[in-house]
Amino acid sequence: MERNLLNERFITIEKLADGELSHKLPGLTVKFSFAETFLGEVLVASTPQGVCYMAFVVRGRDMAESEMMNRFPGVFFEIGTDEHQRRALAALSADEENMETVPLHLKGTDFQLRVWNELLKIPFGETATYGEIAAALQNPKAYRAVGTAIGDNPVAVLIP
């Protein structure tokens, strides 16, 4: 499988907290806002380190906000935008010459982060099966766990 250097070059992932062990993230402030994109309306949220959540608004803003808040129990939410959000939104429509690095600050297990990093390597316009991703992670029998990790991706708009 040919690598997707565009995604790997412009999206960086930092671990926020271990999703299995962290039920509360006290002291963390998450800024969030709504924005229109050519794909539809999205809710984008960020910590001071990077974008932590980005999803389409499908069932209204209240439901989107509630779904986001359920992912981050115990944190302080603040309506607002920042540079991380601006870069994430710009990445949806930017060409390679004008693209800036989008730092992600994701809550997930070590395995989930490995899967999400592997998704960045899938070439634009191509697909990979759960089995292919599991094999690339040197764990070919973990295809179901790969599927679960993909389903839990909090920034599927950026890492499809």
Annotate each predicted stretch with a short phrase.
Residues 141-160:
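Short glycine/serine-rich loop segments
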Residues 1-141:
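Basic nucleic-acid-binding alpha-helical/helix-turn surface characteristic of O6-alkylguanine DNA
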